[in-house]
Amino acid sequence: MNASLNKKLGNVKWGDYKMGELFQRVKTNKLPYKADELPNQPLGEYTLPCLTSSFNNQGLNYYAPREGATILQNVISIPSNSDVYRAYYQPNDFTVLSDAYAIRWIFDDRELSSRQYLFMVMCINKVTDLPVYSYKNKLGGWNVVKNKHIQLPQKRGEIDFDFMESFIAELEAERVAELSAYLTVSGLDNYELSNNEMAIIERYKKHQIPFSEFEFIKIFNNIKQGRRLKKDDQLPGDI
């Protein structure tokens, strides 16, 4: 993050807010599936992403039928039984499967934009996504998290939504500029797709490309195990 954005964070006034006074947990239908019974890619009627406690792919690693499921979008997801309690903004359709839940902005007179949700997720993770929490030392579910306090930018005693919007917009622009510069230097800035490549992408979006499972040994046939390090291999030093 550049100096300008760091300066903005340092200069803004912050206020203390209780999670349960800003968000409410979303009630969802319990699905009659276990994770290991579901495909990990869209297949037939199994097209709705399912939320679990995993922090890979924002917790969405399985797919279920849409029928009978509570379909959510534009909410925040948080694991309730995990090794990592990282919150994510979920802009697209999904449902809750297990060991996680979704929360929604509680006030009807203001609908949060995606950038404002992203900023709040950043603030929430400062109190949930901490090394102290793990499977052995669980954070707990919404009954615990709703009593946590987060810091949000303020202006004249009110939450400064405009600051959140402009901050995330500037952060996005910075990341795009960095990527553009990298692609230019690497000679990869000419990324216009051919008609064939565009057709393949469309087939993938429509789930028309078949996938199959393969054993590692059949694809990578020269797997070598490295030497196992022992305590004697350790050297004193600072990281």
Which residues fall in each region the model found?
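Non-catalytic DNA-recognition/assembly elements of restriction-modification systems
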Residues: 1-57, 155-239
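An amphipathic, hydrophobic-aromatic interaction surface with interspersed Lys/Arg
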Residues: 147-155
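DNA target-recognition domains and sequence-specific DNA-contacting regions of bacterial/archaeal
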Residues: 20-147, 215-239
